[in-house]
Amino acid sequence: MDPSAALHRRPAGGGLGAVSPALSGGQARRRKQPPRPADFKLQVIIIGSRGVGKTSLMERFTDDTFCEACKSTVGVDFKIKTVELRGKKIRLQIWDTAGQERFNSITSAYYRSAKGIILVYDITKKETFDDLPKWMKMIDKYASEDAELLLVGNKLDCETDREISRQQGEKFAQQITGMRFCEASAKDNFNVDEIFLKLVDDILKKMPLDVLRSELSNSILSLQPEPEIPPELPPPRPHVRCC
């Protein structure tokens, strides 16, 4: 039943009855339309060594903020943002994981439910690039083989201190089946939106055609806040990716 119809319905006795507070002043107050629910809920995980800028990338995308001296993530943190892409409204839950090995037993539980994985290294620190094979082993062991992969060389704003060339990043990504590559700067807000939106777009491309609208719409960011509900902790299930 339409709630507004109940406001105008007369009592059974035929009298007007008490005036509803909503009708005081002579006119009913128009109710706000509830926001359209999300068509999809997608989970994305950001991984990489300590200090590569995982938290900065997440916060730049979700809140458009940048912290010069962010504290290292302990275990797992997350943010939620709603985006519209390909005519669909997607509630994107982004998990920011700790880069220290002592947290691996905690963060590994988040891999299996992730539809997309962003692997980040610092272009100014060779050791973070050298750690990439270790992170790929984590992906092979815990992530779904259908998860979309994106390699990101972060801190492009520190170009003069670069230790890893763009060609090195591209070469690594080319060795992994289905992995995309790009460089970005959370500080300068360069390529940050593109990272997440391209990843979501690749995920949507894998979904059955009957759940997608035939017409494609431009990417529109929705900044409406979402309730922050702690993510679920699925049990890890070993799975090896075929490369």
Curated annotation (Swiss-Prot):
InterPro entries according to UniProt: P-loop_NTPase, Rab12, Small_GTP-bd, Small_GTPase, Small_GTPase_Rab
Main location (coarse class): membrane
Membrane-related topology note: Lipid-anchor
Residue window of motif Switch 1: 64-78
Residues with N-acetylmethionine modification: M1
Alphabetical list of CDD domains matching this protein: Rab12
Annotated protein name in UniProt: Ras-related protein Rab-12
Taxonomic lineage of the native organism: Eukaryota, Metazoa, Chordata, Craniata, Vertebrata
